[in-house]
Regions:
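Aromatic- and acid-rich polysaccharide-binding/catalytic face
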Residues: 90-99, 182, 215-225, 238-265, ...
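N-terminal low-complexity, Pro/Thr-rich disordered segments
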Residues: 13, 23-61, 65, 369-375
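Acidic-and-aromatic substrate-binding clefts and catalytic sites of carbohydrate-active enzymes
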Residues: 51, 72-83, 103-116, 185-189, ...
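Substrate-binding cleft and catalytic face of glycoside hydrolase catalytic domains
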Residues: 52, 90, 94-108, 117-230
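Aromatic-rich peripheral "rim/lid" segments of glycoside hydrolase catalytic domains that contact
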Residues: 53-61, 107, 145, 149, ...
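Short, acidic/polar
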Residues: 75-91, 157-167, 233-245, 308-313
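Boundary/entry segment of secreted carbohydrate-active catalytic domains
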Residues: 49-98
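N-terminal export and membrane-targeting signals
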Residues: 1-16
Length: 375
């Protein structure tokens, strides 16, 4: 299959080698004033030990040619955590803006765009030889306060069209794929009751894809959803929606499966689920992977977490149409999980002091095993 642009596989490998060499030479001496273990809520600067890549290698260095292993990026980490940029550059060959490209952050007032946060991430990614996945264009959350539900449908549609067009055009040629619509399904598989559905009708989904295609014909366009990683009723509904959209000529190029998982309740048959979507002729991607555990995180709990991470990566690698696996942040220092799932945390590959956890080792082991077997 054709893989993400604009970076070639060879270019990614060269960039990976250069980045890892730079990190090793620099030693990543880290200084700071933050409190270790703070999940990033205060936004304070942090201290952490020096980062040294595993003797086995790095995720990006071991990834099969053409496969992206990415992470969501938090600008607070870039700006406040001395160890963060080095781990980001050495371990991952793709990035997603965690929040910087969401509408509320990009357009705080009508027609006034705040590109700095997104531009910082894109510029850094290209210096690091990393592909960029855009997130997200149309969502029911993070809509600016100035967008009024009282507007007539025609005005609301035009504002949404202008938003999608402006953002995709701004990053044209620098973002390989976009989450065009995000979380459009309710738990029962029907279209979610949102401002967009109530005012514009179900056609807003197709409209968003067509606007994005016009703004950047080369970007790959994804629909992104949670609770659909395994064979669930919601996944069945998503499969049917994608099939209908493509039958109507809507340019849906890919399906993103978020992957916010619980270590004690992993999804069933991720591999088979990815394959049935791929059979529609679309790419598939794991877009927001984290595996939360109930605290305290014992050694046994972290072992189970590692097994879930490895199984998701294995499922993607077994499906030719799977373009990427992206973790939703790589350090517990900046994870969103504790703020939204009470009693849970430790969801990432690195702990709050940027030390790799068993889950990171499990992913490396899977990649090394693939290299040995040629799989």
């Amino acid at each position: 299959m054709t893989r993400p642009r604009p970076l070639t596989a060879a270019g990614l490998l060269v960039a990976a080698a250069l980045v890892v060499a730079t990190v090793l030479l620099a030693g990543m001496a880290a200084v700071g004033t933050g409190r270790a273990g703070d999940p990033g809520g205060a936004g304070a600067a942090r201290s952490a030990p020096a980062y040294t890549p595993s003797a086995a290698g790095t995720l990006r260095g071991l990834a099969p040619a053409g496969t992206l292993i990415g992470t969501a990026v938090d600008p607070r980490g870039l700006n406040l955590d001395p160890a963060y940029p080095g781990v980001l550059a050495a371990e991952f060959n793709a990035v997603t803006a965690e929040n910087a490209m969401k509408w509320r952050n990009l357009e705080p007032s009508p027609g006034v765009y705040a590109w700095a946060g997104g531009d910082q991430i894109v510029d850094l990614a290209h210096r690091n030889g990393q592909a960029v996945y855009g997130h997200t264009l149309v969502w029911h959350n993070d809509v600016p306060d100035w967008v009024s539900p009282d507007w007539p449908a025609q005005r609301l549609r035009e504002v949404l069209r202008r938003h999608v067009t402006a953002v995709v055009a701004h990053y044209r040629g620098r973002v390989w794929a976009w989450d065009v619509v995000n979380e459009v399904l309710a738990e029962d598989g029907s279209l979610r009751d949102t401002l967009w559905l109530r005012k514009l009708g179900p056609g807003y989904v197709a409209d968003a894809f067509r606007w994005a295609r016009q703004a950047d014909p080369d970007a790959r366009l994804f629909i992104n959803e949670y609770g659909t990683e395994g064979r669930t009723a919601k996944a069945d509904a998503l499969l049917d929606l994608v099939r209908r959209l493509r039958a109507d000529g809507v340019p849906v190029d890919g399906v993103g499966f978020q992957g916010h998982l619980d270590a004690e309740r992993p999804p069933e048959d991720v591999r088979g689920n990815l394959r049935r979507f791929a059979a529609l002729g679309v790419r598939v991607a794991v877009t927001e992977l984290d595996v939360r555990v109930r605290l305290p995180a014992t050694a046994e709990v972290l072992r189970r977490q590692a097994a879930v991470y490895r199984e998701v990566l294995r499922a993607c690698l077994d499906v030719a149409a799977c373009a990427s696996v992206t973790v939703w942040g790589f350090t517990d220092a900046r994870s969103w999980i504790p703020g939204y799932h009470r009693g849970f945390g430790a969801a990432c590959l690195f702990d709050a002091d940027f030390r790799p956890k068993p889950a990171h080792a499990a992913l490396l082991d899977e990649l090394v095993a693939r290299r040995r077997t040629g799989g």
